[in-house]
């Protein structure tokens, strides 16, 4: 298994802190962190970055949505997502965002994150990759496949920790 070193974790925290400072001056106080898949898995298993609490959004949100009908899930997704986020400290990073891409919920994950970041700073670990100038989730042809041009995301800070670049 790939292990993320403590020096890499420190560098990641520095990159995110820098992007968070820049996000304070944007219309959305949102930082998306893009990691190599192996690093993301390691981070999820290890789940320890000093002074950072990793929040499993899919787990927390699914516990709130499971007792609702399919239509109620669609209607209440934004409210339930906000309630999950409200319980987070300012040193929390949202991870495991995959449930937000569930086609039956008919949601746009970026719009949900933007909406949430209007009222509070949000750091989220993107569950996909960056290919050229596009943020991607899933594979083409998959029902939950999504792409977002980085040009469209001008008002969001994107940390590409795959090569240490901040957009």
Where are these regions (language model features)?
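A general structural motif
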Residues: 28, 89-91, 119
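Structural motif
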Residues: 32, 91-95, 123
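Conserved P-loop NTPase "ATPase switch" module shared by AAA+ and STAND
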Residues: 87-105
């Amino acid at each position: 298994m790939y292990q993320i070193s403590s020096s890499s974790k420190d560098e990641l925290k520095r990159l995110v802190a820098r992007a968070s400072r820049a996000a304070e001056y944007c219309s959305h106080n949102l930082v998306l962190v893009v990691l190599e898949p192996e690093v993301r898995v390691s981070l999820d298993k290890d789940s320890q970055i000093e002074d950072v609490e990793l929040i499993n959004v899919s787990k927390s949100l699914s516990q709130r949505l499971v007792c609702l009908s399919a239509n109620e899930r669609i209607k209440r997704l934004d409210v339930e997502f906000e309630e999950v986020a409200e319980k987070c400290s300012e040193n929390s990073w949202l991870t495991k965002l995959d449930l937000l891409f569930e086609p039956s919920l008919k949601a746009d994950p970026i719009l949900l994150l933007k909406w949430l970041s209007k009222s509070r700073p949000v750091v989220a670990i993107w569950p996909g990759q960056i290919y050229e100038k596009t943020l991607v989730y899933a594979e083409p042809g998959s029902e939950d496949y999504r792409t977002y041009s980085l040009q469209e995301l001008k008002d969001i800070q994107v940390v590409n920790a795959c090569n240490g670049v901040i957009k």
